[in-house]
């Protein structure tokens, strides 16, 4: 496998890993020795019949299309803004707006375009005629980076998700609508004169972020048959098409290999993105020879330019694929061990949690003992802590994947299962809130004693319960044989945490946790229905606003019996319910009534009286 570059040396060192995992009768095929210099260069493709697609290329369409010569008045406001239009760092809406300083959400300067504004202007033919290749590429780049950064910010930052949910949803809708609009215009051919492979790569990449796989395949199949079909055969574009075609089974593996082989020439450099995706697909198909060929091809490019980020990223990605997707566990484990080492690789491998959880799952399926799997999990967790990985995202994903696989193997609390769970907890390099929350969320065992012991770990390990912790505990109590009073105590502890955190209202997530532990608790739902209705009757006015209350009641319409019961709280001054219990509201510092629930929700019950019959 690895051509390791010795520190301070000019020559590469070939270690023995390739010879260990690659059949001795095979030969390693590498690409050209020409230097890779650009991630947007275009690679020749001379076969005009690709799996039945007739590729048409005008001689004027090569690589980046030429800019149109248009005479425009100097006073044209859009042309003046286009002259200054550049790729800008994206800032999510919920970070732009600060209620304390009254900052505006959209603080784009007059010299730039917002995503929404540019998307709307694209509908205007006059505006489209003013665009050149750079303008369109910058817009596509801003779409792509905006989508990536917005999602990364939401996943990695500690924010009030109830508060930010609407703005985050609105931003996602803006970005998704914009890329779909751009995709539609590109498919009509109206932007062919300013279209380039690098722009298409950003468009396909954005569609991929939204998992719009059908749109990717449809755009590619349309584009490859157009007058600029050669642009759709650029290696960076094909890298995404191959991935999506494989995931959706639009292309089988033989067809993917045909696309790859027909797009590669022996004397031309293979784009690292294409080598990366082909290597990943090959690993998933169990074709390790092809995957290792792709890896060695990338190592050739690395030796020519050790600082090329696209090559380094592609090497790391194929490495991860061997760990997470290889069913040959001997190969997967060798790549895993190399990835955990801080030294010894010429590229940096970020041990991404989804690949690690897949590796753990494959090890269990492949017959590794649970003790061995627990040790792998322990070492990954330790690695994350040492590398200062974000605990909220990476560790949460890792723990969720591990415990999911663990409880799939041990769905019942046998002695062996309990001992192994204790071993996992004792082996964990750090028992923190993320680990305990994830463990309790995935626990299928309806054993009150075990559940309570896990809850005690918060105190034993000095872990402070957050609002999320209290919600998870309340929700998971649905399967535990608690009394109504014990469920009510968990509810009160949640409210106490909300009040301590400065919440003035009971959020939807809190009502959802209560509903799960009572009305939706399966075998306990009958005895806990009265508890739910009693709590709702007391705290109904503590909802966030009128909209939240209306949506709350509307969500019950799908359950006719429950809707009739809950509607009594709106329609009756003092409704009586079977199994009702006494609920006292303590003194709060922050939590308070915000609405008149009965008055607000009357519009829901009045909308269709037949539902109450």
From Swiss-Prot:
Annotated family: Belongs to the RMD9 family.
InterPro entries from the UniProt entry: TPR-like_helical_dom_sf
Source organism: Candida albicans (strain SC5314 / ATCC MYA-2876) (Yeast)
Positions of region (Disordered): 15-39
Cellular compartments annotated: Mitochondrion inner membrane
Function statement: Binds the 3'-UTR of mitochondrial mRNAs. Involved in the processing or stability of mitochondrial mRNAs.
Range of the transit peptide: 1-58
Subunit field text: Monomer.
GO biological process: filamentous growth of a population of unicellular organisms; filamentous growth of a population of unicellular organisms in response to neutral pH; single-species biofilm formation on inanimate substrate; sporulation resulting in formation of a cellular spore
Keywords in alphabetical order: Membrane, Mitochondrion, Mitochondrion inner membrane, Phosphoprotein, Sporulation, Transit peptide
PTM comment, free text: Phosphorylated. Phosphorylation promotes binding to RNA.
Compositionally skewed regions (Low complexity) per UniProt: 25-39
Topology versus the membrane: Peripheral membrane protein
The keyword Cell wall biogenesis/degradation belongs to this UniProt entry's keyword annotation: no
Any one GO cellular component localisation term in the record: mitochondrial inner membrane
UniProt protein name: RNA-binding protein RMD9, mitochondrial
